[in-house]
């Protein structure tokens, strides 16, 4: 069975010569237009495709004939009867042993875990020389590449199935890999071999294993190379705690591995530096979206649906694999892709419709998708560290600590979740600082320090304050930490910055394609850069972007991106517009990273190669240009790169008002009441905080004061380090508690709520029940007639703008008799006796209050009949939900 895959090179910053011939895969070519196929024929000098008039299908076949690359068919997922079918082939169809003459060299020793996968990260390299002289007369040539490999005994008995995997480099290295689903069965022999096959024979084994239709094969020729030693182990359960920072855009994980975390650590991994004992170990993930396939400590929080034909066994792809799937067709297929699943914390029991590429549709609970993603992270950690974790520590936003704790316990019930000592993300970052202060002995004993933490993540930005004290009591360090959530913006994060850049890009391209001219940003934002902060103070952020937003709406008529508006158009038009949004959002994100991950970039443009790059002009490399432009009412693809250049000064001007508005919203209260100077540490975390505008905005409130922000060069390593501060702090915290060096006392104060909750009286008077940014007024009540069936409550932001309306349904049949003592035991501090004593017979009082441990508010109704009090059902309403939160991927942008 022949098959094909696509290997895109989007975002690869490595400069390559364009002179070498590229190979193409059928799946990639099928996504291209006829114009693009002709361009390939010209670029690759495929004469038949240039001189002959060929249709699209003929062009694809011609390119595949001369530059085609078939995919590797790996045996990885277990299939009933597959192992036995391969055994049968070895017995019946094994042909001649080919001479390798030392061109294939196995690793000295294999350590295989029966209950774990083997990955290229294990670095079991098979060295392959594709042409080598035998020292006498003729050249020995093997044609080995990515393929299936069999582990056999000396009498050719099948013992296991492995994969030979390339690292993706131009001069590739090959590593052994193995699925955890396919067993290794050791025979009673001393000597074992790896049996290698060239592509044709390897594909035949694949087809046999999965019982697919295959061409008859007379014999299977093979290379047989001895193994010096192989050892089979079973991964042990460990007491080490796996810490996970489940992020909106990216997730990280790691553990502190001491010398006794398992009885027999993997010697091979320690030699290679993959496991470091008595140290923090971070889980690395293979970035399969890039040609060089690096191993990174970040996993994108993205899930795609691979196959939902069987609703009981839905197959998903996670992280980089999901991103790779989404890039293959730029979203003109109808399979489900989920971003920002962390936002589902308040609705994780809701049902979610999913669809795969073949059009199969089913529904699953949202918690299933979150669970599968987290299990993938855990499984990867177990594979990296060669153990089985039973104890997990998961950080969460400080304001949603209880909600996340509840969700994690429910969906990961087979693990022990450290909820009693669960750190929030801000405190984890601060503990990273505390641990470093203790290690370097730079703290003042028994003296309190105060810190402000601004965390600008992928989807949200939060402000929390933290006061801590370190005391050395001669037995251990006593660390007292008190944390308060101070403010936040659930709709501002790295994605907002990307979207703002996308708006500018779209406007620029719309002018280029419609008028063949560029437009300067100062024509869209007419306020000088030096006056932006003052202008926001006086008129607000929206006034700054008024003309830009209007120009963006006009650009929609030329480069449409609001694909939700095209649901009543043809399928092709819908996907062309959807392609536009994701294409522009993707390249905006790449340009953002280019500007803020590389020092000295002044100008930037998009191009397919680096030919025009110099010290002044940097290239954001895009493999192919796919932008749809509306011309005379028709949507037309454009594949030529536009001659448009962006500069850093314009991008900085573009983002100034957005970033200052958030910083002003967070710090203005502290600045006005004079408490800002009490903070000795101001910590900026999250990858978006690398942007200099954050620090410039902070200086507006902290004149002359040094902001404690670790200065790194703006390279990818330091950007990643910002994200790792949280998971490293969590690992240090759980390890310090485990070994008894530190006694940590955590306290959480009543959070500052950036929302108000109001309701209208029967006289149409609006009253505040919960006041914004007020720790005192966090409870109130409103009275209604006893027969009320529904109470409407209004949520407003700190500026008084309505965000959402809640409806509490008053179920008369659910009231029960109650005494005030019972009420006090349940709601002490929220419902007072004087407020229940004056309830009349025809009145029901709805008590509305927020608590320190839940990010939302409760509604509790109490009524009276004679002297008897009755209490109705308690209901919790979250402040934030996915109904009113901004979703950049909903087709309305």
What does each of the following model-derived ranges do?
Residues 381-388, 398, 404, 408-448:
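Hydrophobic, small-residue-rich alpha-helical packing segments that form membrane-like cores
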Residues 2-77:
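Basic helix-extension-helix modules of the SAP/HeH family
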Residues 90, 94-234, 619-624, 645-650, ...:
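Acidic low-complexity intrinsically disordered segments
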Residues 231-264, 333-336, 342-343, 438-482, ...:
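Gly/Thr-rich phosphate-binding beta-strand-loop-beta motif of the actin/hexokinase/Hsp70
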Residues 77-202, 275-392, 396, 406, ...:
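Phosphate-binding loop and its immediate beta->loop->alpha context
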Residues 370, 498-503, 507, 546-744:
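Helical "lid/coupling" subdomains associated with nucleotide-phosphate turnover
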Residues 214-238, 421-454, 725-743:
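Conserved phosphate-binding catalytic cores of ATP/NTP-utilizing and phosphoryl-transfer enzymes
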Residues 259-298, 447, 474-487, 710-715:
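Flexible phosphate/Mg2+-sensing switch loops adjacent to catalytic phosphate-binding sites
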């Amino acid at each position: 069975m022949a098959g094909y895959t696509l290997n895109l090179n989007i975002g690869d910053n490595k400069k390559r010569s364009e002179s070498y011939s590229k190979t193409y895969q059928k799946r990639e070519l099928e996504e291209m237009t006829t114009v693009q196929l002709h361009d390939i024929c010209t670029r690759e000098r495929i004469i038949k495709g240039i001189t002959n008039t060929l249709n699209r299908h003929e062009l694809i076949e011609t390119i595949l004939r001369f530059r085609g690359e078939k995919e590797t068919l790996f045996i990885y997922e277990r299939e009933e009867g597959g192992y036995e079918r391969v055994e049968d082939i070895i017995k019946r169809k094994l042909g001649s042993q080919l001479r390798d003459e030392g061109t294939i060299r196995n690793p000295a020793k294999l350590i295989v875990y029966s209950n774990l996968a083997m990955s290229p990260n294990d670095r079991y390299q098979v060295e392959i020389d594709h042409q080598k002289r035998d020292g006498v007369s003729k050249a020995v040539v093997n044609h080995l590449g990515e393929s299936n490999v069999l582990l056999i005994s000396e009498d050719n008995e099948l013992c296991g199935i492995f994969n030979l995997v390339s690292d993706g480099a131009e001069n590739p290295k090959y590593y052994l890999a193995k699925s955890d689903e396919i067993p290794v069965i050791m025979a009673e022999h001393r000597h074992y071999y790896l049996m290698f096959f060239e592509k044709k024979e390897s594909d035949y084994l694949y087809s046999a294993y999965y019982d697919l239709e295959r061409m008859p094969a007379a014999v299977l020729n093979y290379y047989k190379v001895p193994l010096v030693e192989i050892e089979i182990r079973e991964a042990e359960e460990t007491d080490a705690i796996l810490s996970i920072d489940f992020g909106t855009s990216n997730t990280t994980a790691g553990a502190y591995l001491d010398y006794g975390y398992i009885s027999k650590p993997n010697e091979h991994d320690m030699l290679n530096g993959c496991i470091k004992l008595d140290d923090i170990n971070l889980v690395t993930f293979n970035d399969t979206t890039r040609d060089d396939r690096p191993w990174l400590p970040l996993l994108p929080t993205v899930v795609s649906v691979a196959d939902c034909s069987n609703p009981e066994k839905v197959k998903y792809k996670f992280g980089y694999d999901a991103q790779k799937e989404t890039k293959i067709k730029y979203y003109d297929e109808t399979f489900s892709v989920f971003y920002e699943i962390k936002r589902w914390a308040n609705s994780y029991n809701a049902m979610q419709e999913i669809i795969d590429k073949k059009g199969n549709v089913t529904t699953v609970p949202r918690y299933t998708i979150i669970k599968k993603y987290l299990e993938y992270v855990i499984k990867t950690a177990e594979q990296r560290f060669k153990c089985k974790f039973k104890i997990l520590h998961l950080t969460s936003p400080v304001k949603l600590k209880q909600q996340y704790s509840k969700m994690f316990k429910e969906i990961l019930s087979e693990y022990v979740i450290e909820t009693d000592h669960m750190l929030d993300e801000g405190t984890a970052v601060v503990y990273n600082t505390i641990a470093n202060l203790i290690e370097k002995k730079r703290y003042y004993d028994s003296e309190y320090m105060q810190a402000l933490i601004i965390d600008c993540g992928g989807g949200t930005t939060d402000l929390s304050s933290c006061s801590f004290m370190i005391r050395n009591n001669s037995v251990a360090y006593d660390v007292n930490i008190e944390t308060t959530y101070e403010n936040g913006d659930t709709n501002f994060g790295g994605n907002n910055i990307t979207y703002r850049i996308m708006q500018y890009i779209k406007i620029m391209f719309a002018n280029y394609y419609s008028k063949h001219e560029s437009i300067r940003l100062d024509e869209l934002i007419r306020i000088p850069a030096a006056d932006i902060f003052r202008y926001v103070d006086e008129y607000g952020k929206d006034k700054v972007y008024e003309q830009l937003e209007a120009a963006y709406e006009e650009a929609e008529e030329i480069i449409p991106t609001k694909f939700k508006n095209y649901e009543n158009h043809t399928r092709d038009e819908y996907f062309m517009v959807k392609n536009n949004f994701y294409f522009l959002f993707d390249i905006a994100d790449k340009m953002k990273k280019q500007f803020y991950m590389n020092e000295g970039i002044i100008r930037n443009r998009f191009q397919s190669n680096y030919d025009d790059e110099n010290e002044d002009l940097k290239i954001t490399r895009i493999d192919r240009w796919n932008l749809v432009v509306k011309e005379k009412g028709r949507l037309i693809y454009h594949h030529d790169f536009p001659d448009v250049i962006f500069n850093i000064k314009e991008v900085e001007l573009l983002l100034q008002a957005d970033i200052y508005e958030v910083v002003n919203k967070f710090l203005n209260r502290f600045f006005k009441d004079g408490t800002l100077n009490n903070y000795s540490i101001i910590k900026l975390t999250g990858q978006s905080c690398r942007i200099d505008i954050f620090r410039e905005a902070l200086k507006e409130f902290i004149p002359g004061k040094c902001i404690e922000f670790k200065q790194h060069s703006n390279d990818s390593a330091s950007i990643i380090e910002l994200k790792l501060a949280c998971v490293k702090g969590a690992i240090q915290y759980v390890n310090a508690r485990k070994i008894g060096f530190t006694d940590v006392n955590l306290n959480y104060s009543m959070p500052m709520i950036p929302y108000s909750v109001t309701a209208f009286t029967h006289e149409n008077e609006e009253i505040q029940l919960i006041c914004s940014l007020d720790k005192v007024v966090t409870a109130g009540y409103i009275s209604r007639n006893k027969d009320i069936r529904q109470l409407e409550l209004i949520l407003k932001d700190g500026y008084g703008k309505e965000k959402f309306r809640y409806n509490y349904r008053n179920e008369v049949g659910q009231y029960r008799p109650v005494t005030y003592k019972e009420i006090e035991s349940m709601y002490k501090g929220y419902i007072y006796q004087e407020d229940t004593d004056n309830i009349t017979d025809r009145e029901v009082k709805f008590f509305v209050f927020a608590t320190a441990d839940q990010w939302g508010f409760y509604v509790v109704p109490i009524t009276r009949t004679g002297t008897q009090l009755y209490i109705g059902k308690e209901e919790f309403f979250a402040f934030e939900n996915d109904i009113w939160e901004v979703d950049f991927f909903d087709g309305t942008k």
